[in-house]
Amino acid sequence: MKETHRFLIPDYFPQFACKMGACRAACCEGWPVSVSMADYFSLLGLDCAPALRARLDCGIHVVDNPTKEAYARFEPRYDGNCPMRLPDGRCALHAELGEDVLPHVCRLYPRGVRAEDGRFECSCANSCEAVLEMFLDRAEPITFLERELELKLPPLPQRRSVFETLGLAQKIRLHLIAIVQNRRLPLPQRLICLGGLMDRLDCALKNRDKALLEQILAEDPSELCPKLAEPEVGAEHLQFGLQIIEQMMEILDEGSQSIRDCGKAALAYFHGGKSGDIARYEAANAHFSAVFPQWETFFEHMLVNHMFFAQFPFQDRPESMHEEFVALCAVYAILRFLALGCMADRRDAEGLIDDMAAAFRLVDHTEFDRYASRLLKRLGCASSQEICDLIAL
């Protein structure tokens, strides 16, 4: 049954539409699709053609430790696609029986619905190429507005991790987004500002100091940042950052089907010289900046959309504010590394979109935020200067 609520949404949301069969890569490509117990038994009872029944019976399996929310899943085929995907790109379930029979996740994704304290939000994940295509040539910052929406909502899970926010979680999140949208500074410096602000917010929240918290949130982001951002970035810093992200990508590439192709392409480019080859980095950076002069605005939109979709820094996982900040820096570094390495001898916008969407399939469909800061620490990238080196790329 459809419900009507007032949602906070990004301004692009009303224009979003799934490309269906026209999608070059499905937003679930390379990953299993988890469905609830209710959806699983609903699929078992469908009255459908024998060919679709065979697809369902072979494609969906109960997981080893099922729960009501994650009871079974569609395992990807050898080519990374969902077993329900037809040769023309459409979903076999949707094509034969319509939208209403789809599991909740398939019907909504890449849309994500969030509800806390009576507030509803809805946005789209960056793992969808149609979302990123709206961002590539967009000049104006993403804004957020309230809109009444009628949606058939899934059962919304209870939070496993509860953070002290003094009732200001949404206001904190939007203030952090405003820091990333401060175009008076280059994007890496905005991230440095973000880290400094998050340290102050963390202190206020731990001390339950609501007056200090409200004072911080009342500050103008464009006035705050110049006081915080004074990074030291020379050739040796760039070389260190490049070496760290190369090592990180080698590890991620081994375990991620979604970024394997673009990860290998980027690593092959940078490994054409010695590890941390600044000359190859500078050549790729110059080429990328010339082909996509608006790249920084595009990256801003991707980070902002990711932060809103994931409820940064209050994702439902037991991570500290600092670890969430480091994870966001890791996301930025991965995007830059893939963009520069994969596009070093290319000029096609579709290729850039596909590589960025693949990166977000890794970020959105895994516990990336939980292991990113630990992985960087293991690789020797933990101090404030080392994080600055990482995002200077």
Name each model feature, range by range:
Residues 1, 6, 14, 37-38, ...:
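Flexible, acidic/Gly-rich N-terminal and inter-domain linker regions that tether
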Residues 3-23, 60-103, 120-122:
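Immediate flanking context of iron-sulfur cluster ligation sites
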Residues 15-22, 141, 238, 304-307:
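Short, compositionally biased low-complexity segments
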Residues 21, 31, 85, 94, ...:
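Structured loops at beta-to-helix junctions and adjacent beta-edge loops in soluble globular domains
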Residues 26, 30-59:
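Low-complexity, highly charged intrinsically disordered N-terminal segments
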Residues 89, 97-196:
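Internal, well-ordered alpha/beta segment that forms a basic, Gly-enriched binding/recognition surface
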Residues 184-393:
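Hydrophobic, aromatic-lined core segments that form the binding pocket/scaffold
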